[in-house]
Swiss-Prot record:
Signal peptide: none annotated. InterPro entries: Aldolase_TIM (IPR013785), Thiazole_synthase_ThiG (IPR033983), ThiG (IPR008867). This is Thiazole synthase. One of its GO terms (cellular component) is cytoplasm. Catalyzes the rearrangement of 1-deoxy-D-xylulose 5-phosphate (DXP) to produce the thiazole phosphate moiety of thiamine. Sulfur is provided by the thiocarboxylate moiety of the carrier protein ThiS. In vitro, sulfur can be provided by H(2)S. CDD domains: ThiG. It comes from Colwellia psychrerythraea (strain 34H / ATCC BAA-681) (Vibrio psychroerythus). The active site is at 102 (schiff-base intermediate with dxp). 1-deoxy-D-xylulose 5-phosphate binds at residues 163, 190-191, 212-213. It catalyses: [ThiS sulfur-carrier protein]-C-terminal-Gly-aminoethanethioate + 2-iminoacetate + 1-deoxy-D-xylulose 5-phosphate = [ThiS sulfur-carrier protein]-C-terminal Gly-Gly + 2-[(2R,5Z)-2-carboxy-4-methylthiazol-5(2H)-ylidene]ethyl phosphate + 2 H2O + H(+).
Length: 265
């Protein structure tokens, strides 16, 4: 299969995985390894040097990223304005030594929907400052087009609100974005609940999936991480193989013409 391209970096896995909500740092590490992911998201807040737990998580993250030859993807979770997001992105670049940033600017506290106006403002500022921006957005076609026009090579529309596990609420919107932005790297982000959701996204032609809660909150996070890795592979292979068109009428898979009891109506 073709490698996932994120701003010139070739990755074997199309799964991006978060580092929050796990029962323990050890489970987090084992789940990330089981997933096969080479990109791990994290927030600056989780790396508080004054907290021993934060130090332990940071050590595990460094170990796993080194082991899989992967990349850290800092995010701007919790930011509500472009100014806040830009400030946090610059801090993250200095601390984590990466110009990748998962840009989140939340506009509503209830469903954690991104603020499109502030998101566009922050994107423009960060790109002008040399960042490689991976914006988290809704499944709004025009917003995705504007982000692409600003210079985002990677765009991350949601499947459904963060942490809901509702899966792909708007398949039509997501398919339209894929059709209208054929050259963008599209990664489905947020709302994924089960491996079949991720598989469906790949069957649509999406380039990857980013998730966290679906693995971290599973009864067995390590096994669920492995299941998601396999689901993405299955979906990608199905898309590349070419999925049959749906039909309005039934067609027998076994030809009945000239069989002993063939009937013609």
């Amino acid at each position: 299969m073709v490698a996932l391209n994120i701003y010139g970096q070739q990755l074997d896995s199309r799964l991006l995985i978060g580092s929050a909500l796990y029962p323990s740092p050890h489970v987090m590490k084992q789940a990330i390894l089981a997933s096969g992911s080479q990109v791990v998201t994290l927030s600056l807040k989780r790396q508080n040097p004054a907290e021993k737990a934060g130090q332990q998580i940071w050590r595990y993250l460094q170990e796993v990223v080194t082991e899989v030859n992967g990349h850290l993807l800092p995010n701007t979770a919790g930011c509500k304005t472009a100014k806040e997001a830009v400030t946090l992105a610059k801090m993250s670049r200095e601390i984590f030594q990466t110009d990748w940033i998962k840009l989140e600017v939340i506009g509503d506290d209830y469903n954690l929907q991104p603020d499109p106006i502030e998101l566009l403002h922050a994107t423009e500022q960060l790109i002008n400052d040399g960042f490689k921006v991976l914006p988290y957005c809704t499944d709004d076609l025009v917003l995705c087009q504007r982000l692409y026009d600003l210079g985002c090579q990677v765009i991350m529309p949601w499947a459904s609100p963060i942490g809901t596990g509702k899966g792909l609420m708007n398949p039509y919107n997501l398919e339209t974005i894929r059709l209208r932005l054929p050259n963008a790297t599209l990664i489905l982000d947020a709302g994924i609940g089960k491996p079949s959701d991720a598989c469906l996204a790949m069957e649509m032609g999406y380039d990857g999936v980013l998730l966290n809660s679906a693995v971290a909150l599973a009864d067995n996070p390590v096994l669920m991480a492995k299941a998601f890795g396999q689901a993405l592979q299955a979906g990608e292979q199905g898309y590349v193989a070419g999925i049959m068109d749906q039909r309005q009428t039934a067609h027998p898979s076994t030809p009945t013409l000239d069989t002993p009891f063939w009937h013609q109506n």
